[in-house]
From Swiss-Prot:
Database matches in Pfam families: Rota_NS26 (PF01525)
Biased composition (Low complexity): 16-30
Oligomer and partners: Homodimer. Interacts with VP1. Interacts with VP2. Interacts with NSP2; this interaction leads to up-regulation of NSP5 hyperphosphorylation and formation of virus factories. Interacts with NSP6. Participates in the selective exclusion of host proteins from stress granules (SG) and P bodies (PB). Also participates in the sequestration of these remodeled organelles in viral factories.
Positions of Mg(2+) binding: 92
Major site of localization recorded for this protein: host cell
Protein's UniProt name: Non-structural protein 5
Molecular function via GO: ATP hydrolysis activity; magnesium ion binding; nucleotide binding; RNA binding
Protein's UniProt keywords contain Protein biosynthesis: no
Keywords of this entry: Glycoprotein, Host cytoplasm, Magnesium, Metal-binding, Nucleotide-binding, Phosphoprotein, RNA-binding
Length: 198
């Protein structure tokens, strides 16, 4: 099995952040302009902290939720994505905050030179031979433990005791008294062997 991958040139991603007005740039892949500009509002963290600390926990309602506070709304706005009719892709990868006086523009350009070429060749052959050996070594027979055989009689109706029998485990008037005691002795031997093995 052989797998060859030719990666002469991986996809190159170039990202540039401009602080001035957004300029229309053309992507080498789609031919569409990508870019955006937006006025950012810088929050006053000190005023927000004073505002939240001045309120009691009982007075905090839905209007004071995390999505409405100035810090989170600023974060949502700074990470927003805007597209227009000419734009194919627009994204914001910058984590730094912008001052309120400047206009931010993030531009991402994707260029694929040769792409990735994959050539895979798979050669496999499977051969299965099924030869069963019927000869067993004598050591296998010696190592195997032999348990006493228990023969089950088909005529179980003949083992039913009559009314004169006692319930103490002794069979006095059984039709097959000798077979009963032999079977009971075998069962005892099997039970003792199992206990020893455990």
């Amino acid at each position: 099995m052989s797998l060859s991958i030719d990666v002469t040139s991986l996809p190159s991603i170039s990202s540039s952040i401009y602080k001035n007005e957004s300029s229309s740039t053309t992507s080498t892949l789609s031919g569409k302009s990508i870019g955006r500009s937006e006025q950012y509002i810088s929050p006053d963290a000190e005023a927000f902290s004073k505002y939240m600390l001045s309120k009691s926990p009982e007075d905090i309602g839905p209007s004071d939720s995390a999505s409405n506070d100035p810090l989170t709304s600023f974060s949502n706005r700074s990470n927003a994505v805007k597209t227009n009719a000419d734009a194919g892709v627009s994204m914001d990868s910058s984590t730094q905050s912008r001052p309120s006086s400047n206009v931010g523009c993030d531009q991402v350009d994707f260029s694929f030179n040769k792409g990735i070429k994959v050539s895979a060749n798979l050669d496999s052959s499977v051969s299965i031979s099924t030869n069963v050996k019927k000869e067993k070594s004598k050591n296998d027979h010696r190592s195997r433990k032999h348990y006493p055989k228990i023969e089950a009689e088909s005529d179980s109706d003949d083992y039913v005791l009559d009314d004169s029998d006692s319930d103490d485990g002794k069979c006095k008037n059984c039709k097959y008294k000798r077979k009963y005691f032999a079977l009971r002795m075998r069962m005892k031997r099997v039970a003792m062997q199992l206990i020893e093995d455990l």
